[in-house]
């Protein structure tokens, strides 16, 4: 029977999983329905659908891993299951980060005005460039996750069953270091790309603001508003990633830390917040998704009001 801490963990993870899958599933459903309706799909919709699907996979594998850890700890002795979880987790995590960086790059190319020939060429070829980046992100995530599947890494973390199931960590320095580098590679580059996008957007905004001040209009134009929305979106992602990434590093190093099981439980709860909460930020930042979300809320509110029993 789960302890009090384990019961709290299960409740929190189940709640976060429900919210996260609902939010990301809503993004996929609305964009796919619009795609079928118009028989056409925009570049931003492709990015959002790819990101939402990767987030759903990430949420599922984190939650399943946590439930297996608590309810069926003996399954960690199954190398096949461990291999599948490791590969899917690595792929979903890396693809989620890379697709988010694609979103930041899209904001940069779509909104920023930078007087450089290469940047101007990227803006002209934005559809081809972004599709190439999306495909490259998928392939990079796939290569990293497949390369991670090696029997030598099973020595990093192993659960052995004696009279009672106990946690036993057997660390091999060389394989562990290599695994750590592989796991973390997928997070550093997207983070750097988002930072670059943020600073270039900020530079473009400052430059645009100076031009507005020269004309002394005194009002914000649509370009300024677009800059501000894009910068806010990138800042929110960076803040969430700053919380998510260190926790992810700790989780991948939990074999080196006493009470590794408790560390993994806390890490699961924190890491699930990132893909769950960011989906609603994306919904409210996109006019089509926001309109569909508010329409759904009005429908639910009206439905609950009609079902409310009459009290004389």
From Swiss-Prot:
Protein known as: Taste receptor type 2 member 9
Disulfide bonds: none
UniProt keywords, alphabetically: G-protein coupled receptor, Glycoprotein, Membrane, Receptor, Sensory transduction, Taste, Transducer, Transmembrane, Transmembrane helix
GO biological process: detection of chemical stimulus involved in sensory perception of bitter taste
Miscellaneous information on this protein: Several bitter taste receptors are expressed in a single taste receptor cell.
Assigned protein family: Belongs to the G-protein coupled receptor T2R family.
Pfam hit, one: TAS2R
Extracellular face of the membrane: 1-9, 73-86, 147-180, 258-261
Top-level taxon in the UniProt lineage: Eukaryota
InterPro entries, sorted: TAS2R
Keyword Membrane (UniProt): yes
Molecular function GO terms recorded: bitter taste receptor activity; G protein-coupled receptor activity
Transmembrane segments: 10-32, 53-72, 87-109, 129-146, 181-203, 235-257, 262-284
Task performed by this protein: Gustducin-coupled receptor implicated in the perception of bitter compounds in the oral cavity and the gastrointestinal tract. Signals through PLCB2 and the calcium-regulated cation channel TRPM5.
Annotated signal sequence range: none
Subcellular location: Membrane
Glycosylated residues, chain numbering: 164
Originating species: Pan troglodytes
Keyword Transmembrane helix: yes
GO cellular component: membrane; plasma membrane
